[in-house]
């Protein structure tokens, strides 16, 4: 049974605030110990990742982007299902090129409602197709593995 709506709403507000402030500790601090992250669309074939694999990636991204701004367009919260969706446009400066990502983040709250259990992120694929290779080259690493490659197929 999902947590009370007020508890979820407080967590959602903290999540959006940390995202707007682009604060790694506050943002990641809201993730549960069993947190999982999935990049959408599913057709991209990227694997679901646990907290310990995603947190360093977020810290790196947060450390790379400067003058970060988040324009939240819509928030939908379904407390009866323990879920919320945030649609926003993020913009920032980076050494590898300007960042402007239109995205929707789908979150599932923990049973207690005070943590984020999972996050699924749908990005602007046209932008990310151009920007991601520059970002990965700037940091000296290749693209994350696809689900197929991660499974050893």
Swiss-Prot record:
Disulfide bonds: none annotated. Pathway: Pigment biosynthesis. It comes from the Eukaryota. Induction: Expression correlates with the formation of the sclerotia and thus the pigment production and is directly regulated by the cluster-specific activator CPUR_05433. Part of the ergochrome gene cluster responsible for the typical purple-black color of the ergot sclerotia. The ergochrome gene cluster produces several ergot pigments including the yellow ergochrome secalonic acid and its derivatives, as well as the red anthraquinones endocrocin and clavorubin. The pathway begins with the synthesis of atrochrysone thioester by the polyketide synthase (PKS) CPUR_05437. The atrochrysone carboxyl ACP thioesterase CPUR_05436 then breaks the thioester bond and releases the atrochrysone carboxylic acid from CPUR_05437. This is Ergochrome gene cluster protein CPUR_05425.
């Amino acid at each position: 049974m999902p947590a009370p709506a007020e508890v979820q709403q407080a967590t959602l507000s903290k999540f959006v605030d940390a995202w707007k402030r682009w604060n790694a500790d506050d943002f990641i601090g809201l993730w549960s110990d069993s947190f999982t992250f999935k990049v959408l669309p599913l057709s991209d074939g990227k694997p679901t990742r646990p907290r310990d694999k995603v947190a360093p990636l977020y810290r790196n991204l947060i450390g790379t982007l400067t003058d970060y701004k988040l324009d939240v367009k819509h928030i939908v919260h379904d407390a009866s299902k323990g879920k919320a969706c945030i649609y926003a446009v993020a913009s920032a400066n980076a050494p590898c090129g300007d960042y402007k990502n239109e995205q929707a983040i789908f979150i599932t709250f923990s049973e207690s409602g005070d943590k984020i259990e999972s996050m699924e992120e749908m990005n602007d694929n046209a932008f990310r197709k151009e920007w991601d290779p520059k970002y990965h080259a700037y940091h000296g690493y290749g693209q994350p593995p696809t689900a197929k490659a991660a499974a050893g197929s």
